[in-house]
Amino acid sequence: MVRVRFAPSPTGHLHIGGARTALFNWLFARHHNGKFILRIEDTDRSRSTEEYIESIIEAMKWLGLDWDEGPFRQTDRMEVYKAYAYKLLEEGKAYRCYCTPEELEERRQQAMKEGKPPRYDRRCREIKETLNKPFAIRFKMPLEGETVVDDLVKGKVTFKNSEIEDLVILRSDGTPTYNFCVVVDDFEMGITHVIRGEDHLNNTPKQIHIYHALGMNPPEFAHIPMILGTDRARLSKRHGATSVLSYRDEGYLSDALVNFLARLGWSYGDKEIFTREELIKYFNLEQVGKANAVFNAEKLLWLNSEYIKLTPEEKLFELVKPFLIKEGYLKEGETLDKDWACRAIKSLKERCRTLKELAHAMRYYLLDYVEIEPKAKEKYINAETVPVLREVTEKLAALEEFTQERIEKIFMDIVNEKGLKLGQVAQPVRVVMTGSTVSPGIYEVLEIAGKEKTLKRLRRVIDAS
């Protein structure tokens, strides 16, 4: 059975790169009816926090990436790592290193001055006796030959063993190192495939040798391409890439972000929009590219707008509620008629790219009054238009059935009686009702806003003019 894992370090929030790695592992597990395991790699105690662990888990849940086992925490397994490290030491596959951090740094600086790679010089490797000094445990790398990583994405990648230093597996304070913990955990958790960013590729030969030294078979490795900004620089906040939960708070749909992340390095023909079921069905590592993926914030925004169009109004109603409350358009605990709200959303969703934009647009259906944009006010609320607004108001007030058809008839009657163009009647009303010159059809806006709100808003502007 396929068993994969996502193993974030809780030294920050879950960002785009980590979320993409989590998604690829999740899709691979679901495609193969396997298991997806969540492991928290929290051995860096100085930087790992409970807040970040909670944030990562919240982001995973929001993305819908459910896990089958875990979350496991490395800090709960420290004695396990120590036991494996001492096993290697006893078998002569590792050795005690008595070099102090100061000595190591001094030699590193000297090597750099001489133009040599700043690697550990293995001076403690041949010390036979046990000294009464603090020590770290280093793994004995082979001194000759090559290590070939047969990567499922990159193909065969060869490393010279002589260029790989004897890495520390247990520090002098008794804490294990990343490369060692990963091997022990992946073996004990039965991981069959390690899918991770290509920045981990250089760790792979070290890990393979630790597997062999422990008498374990390494899993399959798949190193997925880096994500770059549109300027081909390493992805950062300046490219618009923020934490997963920031996208949630800005009004992105989780399905849209999942779709976007899936396409960062993986493709299926020219298809752009996938349901989760389709992603699970089509995903495989053969179609993960070798070239770096490019993060395009505009593309994500476009994709989100497409998802808003595709999402049923009933679901959008539930999703937009927190934004309406946050913006102050709806009070906590206040209820809206669902059918009415769905009509309002249907009229607006084609024009909105995020839930935040949708909530903002809904203000002119929910508030008694809206703020009018200065330029729109200057152009459409003046001595020429106020008489038209007054006549529209009088005729609308007389309507018994406040429907689009009846509203349209009133507008057309005024157009014909006064010899005006439709825009000369509709635009001033639109500006009063929405605060803007752009909106859904004006008859639809009035019908959804309702007679009371419409008249209240029109009379307020007329009285103030």
From Swiss-Prot:
Binding site for ATP: 237
Catalytic activity, as annotated: tRNA(Glu) + L-glutamate + ATP = L-glutamyl-tRNA(Glu) + AMP + diphosphate
Enzyme class: ligase
PROSITE patterns in the record: AA_TRNA_LIGASE_I
Keyword Transcription regulation belongs to the record: no
One GO cellular component, as annotated: cytosol
InterPro entries associated with the record: aa-tRNA-synth_I_cd-bd, aa-tRNA-synth_I_codon-bd_sub2, aa-tRNA-synth_I_CS, aa_tRNA-synth_I_cd-bd_sf, Glu-tRNA-ligase_bac/mito, Glu-tRNA-synth_I_codon-bd_sub1, Glu/Gln-tRNA-synth, Glu/Gln-tRNA-synth_Ib_cat-dom
Location, primary (coarse class): cytoplasm
UniProt entry keywords in alphabetical sequence: Aminoacyl-tRNA synthetase, ATP-binding, Cytoplasm, Ligase, Metal-binding, Nucleotide-binding, Protein biosynthesis, Zinc
Motif range ('KMSKS' region): 234-238
EC id: 6.1.1.17
Localization per Swiss-Prot or TrEMBL: Cytoplasm
Record note on quaternary structure: Monomer.
PANTHER family per UniProt: GLUTAMATE--TRNA LIGASE (PTHR43311), GLUTAMATE--TRNA LIGASE, MITOCHONDRIAL-RELATED (PTHR43311:SF2)
Annotated protein name in UniProt: Glutamate--tRNA ligase
Naturally occurring in which organism (per UniProt): Thermodesulfovibrio yellowstonii (strain ATCC 51303 / DSM 11347 / YP87)
Gene that encodes it: gltX
